[in-house]
């Protein structure tokens, strides 16, 4: 029987000093035999997805105490990728994932916590906490802050839904007036919560449901809706039950590594492919699997992508559909239900809230449930009132979206497309693979050949796009933006958004060893591995080289002979210390913190995790 970890600091004569300090935090004699649960919050006023979390940690804490545990809250950092976008702030985004994982490990291990509730929401926070949970392998429940309501705006007499990406695209479109840009800007992000499309934050929060580490509705229930409060209340009770099952009954099925097994990772990636999730999820799923010592690789993702259809299209792939619409159609449980009907997921795996995923689907999938409470839960609608307050409205739709032929969520028999929403491409340009979000690619450019326009920074590419130097048919290549080369693997949302602004969203391709925002659409191919800074072929591409992209056949090729590539590689290596670096010095400040990340970062095909030699 495993001993409660916390007893290292709460039991024994020699721990009198530690108990004295615990007492100073409010603990009493009766508390020293209870499980100590870490409430891992990420409140910050910098990020709309986290601005409402301040009081939610204490909400969970009070429920933990009611259930017989001792709750101790701490905070970790949260970077807003949208605010950090387009300048050197983006260098810090991906490295913050490792910092978050480390900070959770530091706090939980230093204080010998027994279990934890992770209150996350945005892009790197959920992945960082997920990595920490699998690294620590103590009972854990995830509950996120929830999605933002979609913006609504009236332009030219027509009401349309919009989000952050629409504001970025409009700002760079010369055909849109300054006044209309202001209207869009003021309407795009109306409430607290993670940005309203199937961007990285919402993708990851949805995947926690498929992994079995969060409650149903975690990925789709709006941050503003009163129904979301139930998830926080239940998380507080559930974590105490999980802790007691593990420490008092020796039940290892309560542990993250037992729940998030290889089969669960396959379920999560199957969901991701079916809903056209952000390409960033590939990085984060690979990183989480690494922390959990799960043998899940790019080859597994490639295998799954060839058999899973697209069952749901959400912004940016479908601009008028947002997370509130996914929720009305039954949320993640409904998508998993359709995948289950098609035999595409493993329904026998445990979750934190049920003995099997199949049991959860039978109760929570609105297409099969007999529970009126479940059906009412998925009627939760946006309030339509700008606010930064959680649980502040209780509006409901008149009816559910149960249409599995033409609705927001489709069946495997009537999918948006038979090919999945993500694909792994390989070829001489990316020997270890690269990723494209096929759900966001127009059918007319699934096969694409064009001349390379080579840039050695995101900034240089943006300047060229806005100066009308990029033409239809070009392949924009942005290199030295990988985990080491950036460092930090910047998101390329501005280049892709500006291509759309210039009317080139369906006429150009973009290939990079950097990554893309979940808000990116178009023929945007990222994570080229090995990256340029590690000797990848992308570092050898020259202006005007022909690049051939074939998504149906999963290939990407630089149309240059092996002999020529060998010659270019030899010439590069001859540069010595200057090899595999940008030819011109870039105007970016790389601090000690960023250099430390770059020194140990692996390429994207390994999840951009750190590799520290023994």
Curated annotation (Swiss-Prot):
Specify the pathway.
Amino-acid biosynthesis; L-isoleucine biosynthesis; L-isoleucine from 2-oxobutanoate: step 3/4; Amino-acid biosynthesis; L-valine biosynthesis; L-valine from pyruvate: step 3/4
Residues recorded as binding Mg(2+), renumbered to this chain, are 81, 123-124, 491
InterPro entries attached here? Answer: Dihydro-acid_dehy_C, DihydroxyA_deHydtase, DiOHA_6PGluconate_deHydtase_CS, ILV_EDD_C, ILV_EDD_N, IlvD/EDD_N
Instruction: Could you list this entry's UniProt keywords, alphabetically sorted.
Output: 2Fe-2S, Amino-acid biosynthesis, Branched-chain amino acid biosynthesis, Iron, Iron-sulfur, Lyase, Magnesium, Metal-binding
State the superkingdom: Bacteria
Co-factor remark: Binds 1 [2Fe-2S] cluster per subunit. This cluster acts as a Lewis acid cofactor.
Among the GO biological process terms of this entry, one is: L-valine biosynthetic process
Positions that bind [2Fe-2S] cluster: 122, 195
Reaction catalysed by this chain? (2R)-2,3-dihydroxy-3-methylbutanoate = 3-methyl-2-oxobutanoate + H2O; (2R,3R)-2,3-dihydroxy-3-methylpentanoate = (S)-3-methyl-2-oxopentanoate + H2O
The active site consists of 517 (proton acceptor)
**Which HAMAP family does its entry note?**
IlvD (MF_00012)
Subunit architecture: Homodimer.
Which family does the entry's similarity section mention?
Belongs to the IlvD/Edd family.
Sorted alphabetically, which PANTHER family does this protein's record hold? D-XYLONATE DEHYDRATASE (PTHR43661), D-XYLONATE DEHYDRATASE YAGF-RELATED (PTHR43661:SF3)
This one is known as: Dihydroxy-acid dehydratase 1
What high-level taxonomic lineage is stated for the organism? Bacteria, Pseudomonadati, Pseudomonadota, Alphaproteobacteria, Hyphomicrobiales
């Amino acid at each position: 029987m495993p001993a409660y970890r916390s007893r290292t600091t709460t039991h024994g004569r020699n721990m009198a000093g530690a108990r004295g300090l615990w007492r100073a935090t409010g603990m009493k004699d009766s508390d020293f035999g209870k499980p100590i649960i870490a409430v891992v919050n990420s409140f910050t006023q910098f990020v709309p997805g986290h601005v409402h979390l301040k009081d939610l940690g204490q909400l969970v804490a009070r429920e933990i105490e009611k259930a017989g545990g001792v709750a101790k809250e701490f905070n970790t950092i949260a970077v807003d990728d949208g605010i950090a976008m387009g300048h050197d702030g983006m260098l810090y985004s991906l490295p913050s994932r490792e910092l978050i994982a480390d900070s959770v490990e530091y706090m939980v291990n230093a204080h010998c916590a027994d279990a934890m509730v992770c209150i996350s929401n945005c892009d790197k926070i959920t992945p960082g906490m997920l990595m920490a949970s699998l690294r620590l392998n103590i009972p854990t429940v995830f509950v996120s802050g929830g999605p933002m309501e979609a913006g609504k705006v009236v332009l030219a007499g027509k009401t349309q839904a919009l989000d952050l990406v629409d504001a970025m695209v409009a700002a760079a479109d010369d055909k849109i007036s300054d006044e209309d840009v202001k209207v869009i800007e003021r309407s795009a992000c109306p409430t607290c919560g993670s940005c309203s499309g199937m961007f990285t934050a919402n993708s990851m929060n949805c995947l926690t449901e498929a992994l079995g580490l969060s409650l149903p509705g975690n990925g789709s229930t709006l941050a503003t809706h009163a129904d979301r409060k139930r998830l926080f209340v239940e998380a507080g009770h559930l974590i105490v039950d999980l802790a007691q099952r593990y420490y008092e009954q020796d039940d290892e099925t309560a542990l993250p590594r037992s729940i998030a097994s290889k089969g669960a990772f396959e379920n999560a990636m199957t969901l991701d492919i079916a809903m056209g999730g952000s390409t960033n999820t590939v990085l984060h799923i690979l990183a989480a699997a690494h922390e959990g010592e799960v043998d899940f690789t790019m080859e597994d993702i490639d295998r799954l992508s060839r058999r899973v259809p697209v069952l749901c299209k959400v912004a940016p792939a479908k601009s008028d559909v947002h997370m509130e619409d996914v929720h009305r159609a039954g949320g993640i449980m409904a998508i998993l239900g359709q995948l289950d009907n098609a035999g595409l997921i493993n329904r026998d795996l445990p979750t934190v809230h049920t003995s099997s995923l199949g049991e959860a689907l039978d109760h929570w999938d609105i297409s099969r449930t007999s529970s009126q409470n479940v059906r009412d839960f998925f009627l939760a609608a946006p309030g339509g009132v700008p606010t930064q307050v959680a649980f502040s409205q209780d509006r409901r739709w008149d009816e559910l979206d149960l249409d599995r032929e033409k609705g927001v969520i489709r069946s495997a028999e009537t999918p948006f497309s038979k090919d999945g929403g993500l694909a792994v491409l390989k070829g001489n340009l990316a020997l270890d693979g690269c990723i494209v979000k096929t759900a966001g690619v127009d059918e007319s450019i699934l096969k694409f050949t064009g001349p390379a326009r080579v840039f050695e920074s995101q900034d240089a590419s943006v300047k060229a796009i806005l100066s009308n130097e990029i033409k239809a048919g070009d392949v924009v290549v942005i290199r030295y933006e990988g985990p080491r080369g950036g460092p930090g693997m910047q998101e390329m949302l501005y280049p892709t958004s500006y291509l759309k602004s210039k009317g080139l969203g369906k006429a150009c391709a973009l290939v990079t060893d950097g990554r893309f925002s979940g808000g990116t659409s178009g023929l945007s191919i990222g994570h080229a591995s090995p990256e340029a800074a590690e000797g990848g072929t992308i570092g050898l591409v020259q202006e005007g080289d022909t690049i051939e992209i074939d998504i149906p056949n999963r290939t990407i090729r630089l149309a240059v002979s092996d002999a020529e590539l060998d010659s270019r590689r030899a010439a590069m290596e001859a540069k010595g210390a200057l090899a595999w670096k940008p030819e011109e010095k870039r105007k970016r400040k790389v601090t000690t913190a960023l250099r430390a990340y770059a020194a140990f970062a692996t390429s994207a095909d390994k999840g951009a995790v750190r590799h520290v030699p023994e």
